[in-house]
From Swiss-Prot:
This is Aquaporin NIP1-2. A motif (NPA 2) lies at residues 230-232. PANTHER family: AQUAPORIN NIP1-1-RELATED (PTHR45724:SF13), AQUAPORIN NIP2-1 (PTHR45724). Water channel probably required to promote glycerol permeability and water transport across cell membranes. GO terms for biological process: arsenite transport; hydrogen peroxide transmembrane transport; response to arsenic-containing substance. The gene is NIP1-2. A motif (NPA 1) lies at residues 111-113. The modification Phosphoserine is found at residue 283. NCBIfam families: MIP. Gene3D superfamilies: Glycerol uptake facilitator protein (1.20.1080.10). The keyword Zinc-finger does not apply.
Length: 294
């Protein structure tokens, strides 16, 4: 009896083992089938929102450069009808409107210097900087191309012989333009850091504050350097019009000024948090940053 019961037990145990192996194989096959689908879904869930942000940066930069530079072109072609204060108002209002329209989608950078400054402080993912910068340059280039089609196709605008050029050129010395671009971009980024990244600030007023800062900077620096504050704003028209004179000023100075402005604000702001946690706070860009981290 002991042998029979033992054999029966072995047979039953063997059957159980076989069934378990079959179930394991079926589960592995199902996991192998569904695993690529889950991976694909996760990639789509990450890439689609990011592509939306890039599209927002392209469109926002396009509208910003188109509106601001169109004011410059109209003012030039129509006997200074817009005037310098008018041009400044157009730039400021355009920035304000676009911040409120697209800020909740992409953060409303529209400026490689702002993107790089945020990344240097840890408020923006470093790996997303190249895509953002490329999107901003694309938007600026498309806007400049549109304006060239609308306001003339002169071939020698860089020499100053023709009156339509929507880019930026130093009116004085290179040093003068470099310094003033550094100062106004520092000022702009300092304000952005205060109203758009500090939990204690009123984030809803970020667009108004940033737009007003741009308006003031254009009035101050417009006649001297063109008040770029934005490497993309200068690079797009420069490529479209093949005019690269003094372009290095408008690439280097705004980036250095923006990074300096962001870090100086982080140092002077009053907070009970340790220094390592300062860059974790935010208000206006809080949603965007959280979305990027997911």
């Amino acid at each position: 009896m002991a042998e029979i019961s033992g054999n029966g037990g072995d047979a039953r145990d063997g059957a159980v083992v076989v069934n378990l192996k079959e179930e394991d194989e079926q589960q592995q096959q199902q996991q192998a089938i569904h695993k690529p689908l889950k991976k694909q879904d996760s990639l789509l869930s990450i890439s689609v929102p990011f592509l939306q942000k890039l599209m927002a940066e392209v469109l926002g930069t396009y509208f910003l450069i188109f509106a601001g530079c169109a004011a410059v072109a109209v003012n030039t072609q129509h006997d200074k009808a817009v005037t310098l204060p008018g041009i400044a108002i157009v730039w400021g209002l355009t920035v304000m409107v676009l911040v409120y329209s697209l800020g909740h989608i992409s953060g409303a950078h529209f400026n490689p210097a702002v993107t790089i400054a945020f990344a240097s402080c840890g408020r923006f993912p470093l790996k997303q900087v190249p895509a953002y910068v490329i999107s901003q340059v694309i938007g600026s280039t498309l806007a400049a191309a549109t304006l060239r089609l609308l306001f003339g196709l002169d071939q020698d605008v860089c020499s100053g012989k023709h009156d339509v050029f929507v880019g930026t050129l130093p009116s004085g010395s290179n040093l003068q333009s470099f310094v003033i671009e550094f100062i106004i971009t520092f000022y702009l980024m300092f304000v952005i850091s205060g109203v758009a990244t500090d939990n204690r600030a009123i984030g809803e007023l970020a667009g108004l504050a940033v737009g007003s800062t741009v308006l003031l900077n254009v009035i101050i620096a417009g006649p001297v350097s063109g008040a770029s504050m934005n490497p993309g704003r200068s690079l797009g028209p420069a490529m479209v019009y093949s005019c690269y004179r003094g372009l290095w000023i408008y690439i280097v100075s705004p980036i250095v000024g923006a990074v300096s402005g962001a870090w100086v604000y982080n140092m002077v702001r009053y907070t009970d948090k340790p220094l390592r946690e300062i860059t974790k706070s935010g208000s206006f860009l809080k949603t965007v940053r959280n979305g990027s981290s997911r």
